[in-house]
Amino acid sequence: MQKQQVKKVAVTWRKRYLILLYIGIIIFGLMACNSKSGIEKTKSLGSDSTAAENKIDLTKIKIGYCTPSLNAPFYVVLSQYIKKNAEGFGMKFVSADGQDDIIKQITSIEDLIAAGVNVLIVNPLDHKAMVPAVNAAVKSGVPVFIVDSYIDPTANYITSIQANNEGNGELIGEWIVNKMGKTKIKAALISGSQGNPVGKEKRLGFIRGFSEMQLMSQGNVDLTIVSQGWGNWTNNGGLKAMEDILVANPDINLLVAENDAMGMGALKAINEAGKAAGITIVGFDGQKEAYELIKEGKFGATALNSPEELGRLVVNAVVKYLNGERQIDKVIYTPAVLITKDNVDKYYDPKAIF
């Protein structure tokens, strides 16, 4: 594991900058509602929960899936659910691992096309770099579906199935204001990988949700982000990033991790430093182990990004397309859901694989 880079960033909210920020939020953002535990937010660009009705023989269809990596539990489980749903319709399933490398993911897509897949599902490592590979697949006659992320609109894809990452971030930000009150926030971020659009959506949603809630409830915004580490979406990456953060900023009182795995790794570093009582930890994805930590009072909150639901929805869209349906939303979002100690029992399943 490469040594984690820690980028110090000071976010100082001055009055004039706050006004500009808030105007920008109103214009470009999704307006947030007051959050309560378990509140859901949806985007207007479509959500499709209806089961696909299959009227054709799919047993000769080979569906290919290219994941950006298998280094995080989320990616592993998402691949498993896509496989389960595809095989449930009788389709053959093949997959390829991009191994956290853009060139490798591009060649993996090419390999899947060469292997004769009829349909391709891609979770892009980079939303711009994957465009030529996706368009080449479509040109060869293979329709492409995007899952768990988005791709540049110049790509010729059928639909993108993704979590409402900005909405999840907003819910996390609102919860922090309600939880920490007028405590002066000194926060650190642990992000996944540089340039990843999903991580960016989460942290911008967090800043927006925090700003709107604190402005509404306290009349001002006071948030300082003193450090950003990179954990590559892994438990060990979160541990290493947090160790570096604590050396430079031992007095932080909030950690926002862009997935639960990194947050749990960071918790280990926080415990080893003897600072668990003074730092609130929040994450994203809704991993089973994070739910357990919430129940134990060691994790503040997480936001739901269900690999099970993503796997179901993307295969649903594939089946509808193969059955001739063309009125498929260009983007399909799963709802944003906040999980805290108040509603964790509703979502926690000790037998869940994620």
Segment roles from a protein language model:
Residues Q2-K3, A10-W13, Y17, A32-F354:
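A residue-level marker of the well-folded mature domains of exported/periplasmic proteins
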Residues L20-G29:
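Bacterial N-terminal signal peptides
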